[in-house]
Amino acid sequence: MEQYYGTGRRKEAVARVFLRPGNGKVTVNGQDFNEYFQGLVRAVAALEPLRAVDALGRFDAYITVRGGGKSGQIDAIKLGIARALVQYNPDYRAKLKPLGFLTRDARVVERKKYGKHKARRAPQYSKR
């Protein structure tokens, strides 16, 4: 059986996505997609690359995702699915790239500096 693989990362989340020809079943860490991202409206964004190339019901997705929070995991899955689709059909790159699905979002949390409360929040300063 043929399968296509893509890795997606976002913040601290890492998603490994395996696409196999099927009927649209999506499994995340052994659970159904809707069960894993229960009640999160944003979760449907993870499947946008499949919608963009009209492949929503043509593949089963087996996904393992670790680290980060749910939002980062959703974006990691989105990138992983897009990369797996390009592996399946390199012509999809032309559709997915302009929509931003193949771009790794490199923004990460800025580190806390000493002498400050947070990354940028400085202690209150009194002029007089």
UniProtKB/Swiss-Prot annotation:
InterPro entries: Ribosomal_Su5_D2-typ_SF, Ribosomal_uS9, Ribosomal_uS9_bac/plastid, Ribosomal_uS9_CS, Ribsml_uS5_D2-typ_fold_subgr. Keywords: Ribonucleoprotein, Ribosomal protein, RNA-binding, rRNA-binding, tRNA-binding. One of its GO terms (biological process) is translation. GO terms for cellular component: cytosolic small ribosomal subunit. GO terms for molecular function: rRNA binding; structural constituent of ribosome; tRNA binding. Pfam families: Ribosomal_S9. It comes from the Bacteria. NCBIfam families: PRK00132.1. Belongs to the universal ribosomal protein uS9 family. Part of the top of the head of the 30S subunit. The C-terminal region penetrates the head emerging in the P-site where it contacts tRNA. Part of the 30S ribosomal subunit. Contacts proteins S7 and S10. This is Small ribosomal subunit protein uS9. It comes from Thermus thermophilus (strain ATCC BAA-163 / DSM 7039 / HB27). The gene is rpsI.
